A protein has these predicted regions:
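Acidic-enriched, low-complexity/disordered segments with a strong bias for Aspartate over Glutamate
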Residues: 9, 29-30, 46-49, 68, ...
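Short beta-strand micro-motifs in enzyme catalytic cores
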Residues: 30-32, 73-81
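Generic structural motif
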Residues: 39-41, 60, 82-85
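A short, charged, amphipathic alpha-helix used as a generic interaction element across diverse proteins
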Residues: 49-73
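Active-site and NAD+-binding cores of ADP-ribose-processing enzymes
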Residues: 79-130
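ADP-ribose/NAD+-binding catalytic cleft of ART/PARP-like enzymes
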Residues: 1-51, 55, 120, 124-125, ...
Length: 130
């Protein structure tokens, strides 16, 4: 059993936009895919005229296995969907946001970041403490 949840819909893995937000939000609603970014100038195969590119996977284990054997690749990141999140425009100023936001996260943030019904309310009541 994995420490991390798999993509919510494996049929959609690889169809999400490459350019998304990066980090932030404190909470996530859905795991969309795990990404391994490849850099040709660091030894990855040059598949896109020297440009950075990624491979998408449904599980962390698939992404990690690929990353471990692919020269010039980064450690896996996870693409998450946020329907509600915390914006922190300046340090310790927290704003509850709603909508749909796609963002890449460090995989380990999944361990404590799944949004439950009261997660954001509790976060705000505690002044930003988790």
């Amino acid at each position: 059993m994995s420490r991390y949840p798999a993509a919510i819909d494996s049929a959609l893995v690889g169809t999400y936009p490459a350019h998304t937000k990066s980090g932030g939000g404190y909470f996530y609603d859905d795991v969309l895919e795990f990404r391994v970014w490849c850099r040709p100038w660091q030894g990855a195969p040059d598949e896109f005229d020297g440009e950075i590119y990624y491979y998408a996977f449904a599980t962390y284990e698939q992404a990690k296995a690929f990353s471990d054997v692919t020269a010039g690749s980064e450690q896996p990141l996870v693409l998450v969907r946020q329907r509600e999140w915390i914006d922190e425009p300046v340090s310790n100023q927290f704003i509850h946001k709603r909508g749909e936001r796609l963002t890449e996260w460090l995989v380990e943030w999944l361990l404590d970041g799944k949004r439950e019904e009261q997660s954001i309310e509790l976060f705000m009541r505690q002044g930003g403490g988790l």
